[in-house]
């Protein structure tokens, strides 16, 4: 129990500074299977319907929408990448529920489970220019404070290396990769793991077999990054001190996600 308390306190201290005034940052949040309540014709999501084994009705759906929006608003960064949303209507519902005035980009991933990526952003801070879709990844090229910035959200993408080969051909391309990068040899493209400090300190964003793991990470070629870590608030955890999941062993718990968000931010309005 003492070890758990020390871990949680270290996370709280690490994330408190992310609320500083004029920093710019990007977060990534695996929302853990946020389906709507309507059966799909293209993949099997019957479990997440009112008649399915999870009893996924409009009340449970609306509750989770509000929870995800609360997390996004709490993070309060100009760009938040999401993974695990079923479709564009789900993204619209999240954005509508947010207090922050987010615009969004959504693309259908056409995966076996029907789960997509979305990028929420403040339109006065990040200016998207081009969207590139890859299996297991969403890449958005744009500008932030008159500097080129490319944001890649990924979840076990097998084509991430090919995408990076394309992106690295551009000069002065500032790139941030967030999510589950699998076994990517990121050093090949001169990237560093911005979340390495959190990993070495034993911090994680998911519990596997009773142990914290940093399932998602942040990779970047930007040298001026100020901090990258796991985002934590007490209400994101259950009474055991683990991520407050929507379902646990098939039982509805009404929580947020079995993952915690991760983030990277920069002081002085993008000093890169």
What are these regions (language model features)?
Residues 3-15:
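Sec-dependent N-terminal signal peptides
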Residues 18-97, 109, 267-272:
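N-terminal, active-site-proximal structural segment of metallo-dependent hydrolase catalytic domains
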Residues 19, 168-176, 182-272:
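Metal-dependent phosphoester-hydrolase catalytic domains
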Residues 23-36, 130, 148-157:
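Active-site-proximal beta-strand elements of phosphoester/diester hydrolases
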Residues 26-31, 68-91, 120, 151-154, ...:
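Active-site beta-strand/loop signature of hydrolases that rely on acidic residues for catalysis
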Residues 31-34, 86-89, 109-113, 125-127, ...:
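Solvent-exposed loop/turn segments at secondary-structure junctions
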Residues 53, 60-68, 102-106, 200-206, ...:
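N-terminal post-signal-peptidase region of extra-cytosolic proteins
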Residues 85-148, 154:
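Structured beta-strand-rich core segments of catalytic domains in phosphoester-bond hydrolases
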């Amino acid at each position: 129990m003492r070890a758990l308390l020390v871990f949680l306190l270290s996370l709280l201290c690490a994330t408190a500074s992310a609320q500083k005034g004029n920093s710019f940052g990007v977060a990534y949040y695996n929302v853990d299977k946020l389906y709507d309540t309507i059966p799909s014709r293209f993949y099997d999501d019957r479990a997440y319907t009112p008649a399915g084994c999870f009893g996924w009705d409009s009340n449970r759906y609306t509750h989770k929408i509000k929870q995800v929006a609360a997390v996004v608003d709490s993070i309060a960064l100009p760009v938040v990448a999401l993974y695990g949303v079923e479709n564009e209507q789900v993204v619209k519902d999240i954005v509508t529920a947010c207090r922050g005035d987010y615009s969004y980009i959504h693309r259908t991933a056409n995966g076996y489970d029907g789960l997509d990526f979305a990028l929420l952003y403040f339109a006065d801070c990040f200016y998207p220019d081009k969207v590139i879709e890859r299996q297991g990844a969403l890449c958005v090229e744009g500008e932030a404070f008159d500097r080129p910035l490319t944001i890649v959200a990924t979840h076990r993408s097998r084509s991430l290396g090919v995408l990076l080969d394309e992106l690295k051909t551009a000069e002065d391309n500032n790139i941030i990769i967030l999510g589950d990068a699998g076994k990517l040899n990121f050093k090949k493209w001169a990237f560093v793991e911005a979340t390495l400090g959190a990993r070495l300190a034993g911090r994680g964003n998911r519990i596997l077999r009773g142990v914290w793991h940093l399932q998602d990470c942040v990779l970047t070629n930007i040298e001026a990054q100020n901090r990258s870590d796991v985002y934590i608030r007490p209400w994101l955890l259950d009474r055991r001190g683990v991520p407050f999941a929507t379902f646990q062993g098939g039982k509805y718990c009404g929580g947020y996600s079995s993952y915690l968000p991760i983030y990277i931010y920069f002081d002085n309005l993008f000093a890169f």
